[in-house]
Protein backbone atom coordinates (compact mmCIF):
# COMPACT_ATOMS: atom_id res chain seq x y z
CA UNK A 1 0.00 0.00 0.00
CA UNK A 2 1.01 3.60 -0.55
CA UNK A 3 0.17 7.03 0.82
CA UNK A 4 -3.51 7.82 0.30
CA UNK A 5 -4.55 4.22 -0.38
CA UNK A 6 -7.76 2.96 1.22
CA UNK A 7 -7.43 0.79 4.30
CA UNK A 8 -11.18 0.32 4.58
CA UNK A 9 -14.57 1.91 5.17
CA UNK A 10 -17.20 2.22 7.90
CA UNK A 11 -20.84 3.08 7.24
CA UNK A 12 -24.39 3.27 8.55
CA UNK A 13 -27.75 4.19 7.05
CA UNK A 14 -31.01 4.48 8.96
CA UNK A 15 -34.55 5.74 8.50
CA UNK A 16 -34.29 7.54 11.86
CA UNK A 17 -31.09 9.16 13.11
CA UNK A 18 -29.90 8.17 16.61
CA UNK A 19 -27.59 9.85 19.10
CA UNK A 20 -24.93 8.78 18.58
CA UNK A 21 -25.04 7.56 15.00
CA UNK A 22 -22.40 4.86 14.56
CA UNK A 23 -20.73 4.04 11.23
CA UNK A 24 -19.36 0.50 11.65
CA UNK A 25 -16.84 -1.78 9.95
CA UNK A 26 -13.49 -3.40 10.67
CA UNK A 27 -10.36 -1.57 9.56
CA UNK A 28 -6.77 -2.09 10.76
CA UNK A 29 -5.23 1.34 11.36
CA UNK A 30 -1.68 2.59 11.95
CA UNK A 31 -0.34 5.75 13.56
CA UNK A 32 -0.39 8.57 11.02
CA UNK A 33 -3.38 7.28 9.04
CA UNK A 34 -6.35 9.57 8.36
CA UNK A 35 -10.03 8.89 9.09
CA UNK A 36 -12.52 11.00 7.11
CA UNK A 37 -16.23 10.96 8.00
CA UNK A 38 -19.11 12.41 5.94
CA UNK A 39 -22.59 12.67 7.45
CA UNK A 40 -25.72 13.22 5.38
CA UNK A 41 -28.98 13.97 7.17
CA UNK A 42 -32.52 14.71 6.05
CA UNK A 43 -33.85 18.23 6.68
CA UNK A 44 -31.90 19.22 9.82
CA UNK A 45 -28.15 19.66 10.33
CA UNK A 46 -27.52 18.20 13.80
CA UNK A 47 -24.16 16.37 13.65
CA UNK A 48 -21.80 18.12 16.07
CA UNK A 49 -18.75 15.89 16.46
CA UNK A 50 -17.16 12.46 16.14
CA UNK A 51 -15.21 10.15 18.45
CA UNK A 52 -13.60 6.71 18.15
CA UNK A 53 -10.86 4.49 19.44
CA UNK A 54 -7.33 5.08 18.07
CA UNK A 55 -8.03 8.74 17.19
CA UNK A 56 -7.45 11.28 19.95
CA UNK A 57 -9.41 14.11 18.35
CA UNK A 58 -11.75 14.57 15.41
CA UNK A 59 -12.29 18.03 13.94
CA UNK A 60 -15.05 19.33 11.70
CA UNK A 61 -13.91 20.62 8.33
CA UNK A 62 -16.42 23.47 8.75
CA UNK A 63 -19.89 24.17 10.12
CA UNK A 64 -21.66 22.07 7.48
CA UNK A 65 -24.40 23.14 5.08
CA UNK A 66 -28.17 22.91 5.11
CA UNK A 67 -29.22 22.69 1.45
CA UNK A 68 -32.93 22.43 2.23
CA UNK A 69 -34.11 18.82 2.20
CA UNK A 70 -30.63 17.40 2.86
CA UNK A 71 -27.73 18.56 5.01
CA UNK A 72 -24.08 17.56 5.19
CA UNK A 73 -21.08 17.88 7.48
CA UNK A 74 -17.64 16.25 7.51
CA UNK A 75 -15.11 15.38 10.22
CA UNK A 76 -11.54 14.11 10.14
CA UNK A 77 -9.03 12.66 12.59
CA UNK A 78 -5.42 11.48 12.53
CA UNK A 79 -4.79 8.02 13.98
CA UNK A 80 -2.66 8.21 17.15
CA UNK A 81 -2.47 4.52 18.10
CA UNK A 82 -2.62 1.29 16.12
CA UNK A 83 -5.47 -1.21 16.27
CA UNK A 84 -8.67 -2.31 14.56
CA UNK A 85 -11.25 0.43 14.17
CA UNK A 86 -14.78 -1.00 14.33
CA UNK A 87 -16.98 2.01 15.08
CA UNK A 88 -17.11 5.80 14.94
CA UNK A 89 -19.67 7.65 17.06
CA UNK A 90 -21.19 10.80 15.57
CA UNK A 91 -23.03 13.03 18.03
CA UNK A 92 -26.39 14.14 16.63
CA UNK A 93 -29.96 14.88 17.62
CA UNK A 94 -32.16 11.78 17.56
CA UNK A 95 -35.23 12.18 15.36
CA UNK A 96 -37.24 10.64 12.54
CA UNK A 97 -34.84 12.09 9.95
CA UNK A 98 -33.01 9.73 7.61
CA UNK A 99 -29.23 9.53 7.92
CA UNK A 100 -26.35 8.14 5.85
CA UNK A 101 -22.90 8.37 7.44
CA UNK A 102 -19.77 6.97 5.79
CA UNK A 103 -16.08 6.97 6.71
CA UNK A 104 -12.88 6.09 4.87
CA UNK A 105 -9.51 5.29 6.43
CA UNK A 106 -6.58 6.46 4.30
CA UNK A 107 -3.03 5.19 4.68
CA UNK A 108 -0.51 7.75 5.93
CA UNK A 109 1.79 9.06 6.99
CA UNK A 110 -0.01 12.40 7.35
CA UNK A 111 1.51 15.36 9.16
CA UNK A 112 0.42 16.04 12.74
CA UNK A 113 -1.70 18.96 11.45
CA UNK A 114 -2.59 17.66 7.99
CA UNK A 115 -5.62 19.71 6.90
CA UNK A 116 -4.75 22.12 4.08
CA UNK A 117 -7.50 23.03 1.61
CA UNK A 118 -10.84 23.67 3.30
CA UNK A 119 -13.05 25.79 1.01
CA UNK A 120 -16.68 26.62 1.75
CA UNK A 121 -19.23 23.94 0.87
CA UNK A 122 -21.34 24.36 -2.26
CA UNK A 123 -24.60 23.15 -3.80
CA UNK A 124 -24.94 21.82 -7.36
CA UNK A 125 -28.06 20.10 -8.71
CA UNK A 126 -27.19 19.81 -12.42
CA UNK A 127 -24.87 17.05 -13.66
CA UNK A 128 -21.95 17.27 -13.89
CA UNK A 129 -21.63 18.29 -10.25
CA UNK A 130 -18.61 20.39 -9.27
CA UNK A 131 -17.26 20.35 -5.73
CA UNK A 132 -15.47 23.52 -4.55
CA UNK A 133 -12.02 24.23 -6.00
CA UNK A 134 -9.20 23.45 -3.58
CA UNK A 135 -7.12 26.52 -4.35
CA UNK A 136 -3.33 26.29 -4.55
CA UNK A 137 -2.07 23.58 -2.21
CA UNK A 138 0.57 24.07 0.48
CA UNK A 139 2.76 21.25 -0.84
CA UNK A 140 2.92 18.94 -3.83
CA UNK A 141 2.23 15.65 -2.05
CA UNK A 142 -1.33 15.74 -0.71
CA UNK A 143 -4.47 13.64 -0.57
CA UNK A 144 -7.56 15.22 -2.11
CA UNK A 145 -10.81 14.15 -0.44
CA UNK A 146 -14.16 15.12 -1.92
CA UNK A 147 -17.55 14.25 -0.50
CA UNK A 148 -21.19 14.82 -1.33
CA UNK A 149 -24.69 14.40 0.02
CA UNK A 150 -27.37 14.34 -2.66
CA UNK A 151 -31.14 14.29 -2.24
CA UNK A 152 -31.76 11.25 -4.40
CA UNK A 153 -31.01 7.52 -4.22
CA UNK A 154 -29.34 7.48 -7.65
CA UNK A 155 -25.72 6.40 -7.99
CA UNK A 156 -23.17 9.09 -8.85
CA UNK A 157 -20.02 8.42 -10.87
CA UNK A 158 -16.72 10.05 -9.96
CA UNK A 159 -15.04 12.03 -12.74
CA UNK A 160 -11.35 11.11 -13.17
CA UNK A 161 -8.99 11.63 -11.42
CA UNK A 162 -11.56 11.49 -8.63
CA UNK A 163 -12.20 7.88 -7.51
CA UNK A 164 -15.34 6.98 -5.57
CA UNK A 165 -14.42 5.13 -2.37
CA UNK A 166 -17.80 4.64 -0.69
CA UNK A 167 -21.44 5.53 -1.39
CA UNK A 168 -24.48 4.74 0.76
CA UNK A 169 -28.17 5.56 0.32
CA UNK A 170 -30.92 5.71 2.93
CA UNK A 171 -34.21 4.72 1.27
CA UNK A 172 -34.79 7.13 -1.64
CA UNK A 173 -34.17 10.18 0.55
CA UNK A 174 -30.45 10.85 0.27
CA UNK A 175 -27.06 9.37 -0.58
CA UNK A 176 -23.67 10.14 0.96
CA UNK A 177 -20.37 9.47 -0.79
CA UNK A 178 -16.61 10.06 -0.51
CA UNK A 179 -14.04 10.18 -3.31
CA UNK A 180 -10.30 10.79 -3.31
CA UNK A 181 -7.01 10.80 -5.17
CA UNK A 182 -3.37 11.72 -4.51
CA UNK A 183 -1.73 14.68 -6.24
CA UNK A 184 1.93 15.46 -6.86
CA UNK A 185 1.64 19.19 -7.64
CA UNK A 186 0.32 22.28 -5.85
CA UNK A 187 -2.07 23.18 -8.69
CA UNK A 188 -5.69 23.82 -7.69
CA UNK A 189 -8.15 20.99 -8.37
CA UNK A 190 -11.93 20.89 -8.73
CA UNK A 191 -13.43 17.45 -8.00
CA UNK A 192 -16.49 16.45 -10.02
CA UNK A 193 -19.24 13.83 -10.23
CA UNK A 194 -21.94 12.89 -12.73
CA UNK A 195 -25.32 11.25 -12.19
CA UNK A 196 -29.00 11.76 -11.51
CA UNK A 197 -29.92 15.36 -10.74
CA UNK A 198 -30.95 15.63 -7.07
CA UNK A 199 -33.51 17.82 -5.34
CA UNK A 200 -30.58 19.48 -3.60
CA UNK A 201 -27.03 18.63 -2.59
CA UNK A 202 -23.98 19.44 -0.48
CA UNK A 203 -20.47 19.09 -1.93
CA UNK A 204 -17.13 19.49 -0.18
CA UNK A 205 -13.42 19.40 -0.96
CA UNK A 206 -10.48 19.01 1.41
CA UNK A 207 -6.80 18.21 1.10
CA UNK A 208 -4.45 16.63 3.61
CA UNK A 209 -0.66 16.89 3.72
CA UNK A 210 1.68 13.93 3.53
CA UNK A 211 4.35 13.78 6.24
CA UNK A 212 7.40 14.00 3.99
CA UNK A 213 9.87 13.78 6.87
CA UNK A 214 8.48 10.49 8.18
CA UNK A 215 8.08 9.05 4.71
CA UNK A 216 11.57 10.00 3.55
CA UNK A 217 13.14 8.60 6.72
CA UNK A 218 11.61 5.15 6.31
CA UNK A 219 14.22 2.40 5.77
CA UNK A 220 14.64 1.58 2.10
CA UNK A 221 15.27 -1.90 0.66
CA UNK A 222 17.86 -2.27 -2.07
CA UNK A 223 18.71 -5.37 -4.06
CA UNK A 224 22.31 -6.60 -3.93
CA UNK A 225 23.50 -7.58 -7.40
Where in this protein do the model-derived segments appear?
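Primarily extracytoplasmic/secreted proteins
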Residues: 1-225
Amino acid sequence: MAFGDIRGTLQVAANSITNPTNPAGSVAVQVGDLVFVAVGEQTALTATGATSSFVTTYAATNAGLDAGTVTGRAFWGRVTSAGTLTQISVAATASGDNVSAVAVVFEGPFTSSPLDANPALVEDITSSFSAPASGTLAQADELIVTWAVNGVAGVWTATSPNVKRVELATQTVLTTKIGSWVVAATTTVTPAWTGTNPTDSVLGTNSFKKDLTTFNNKPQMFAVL
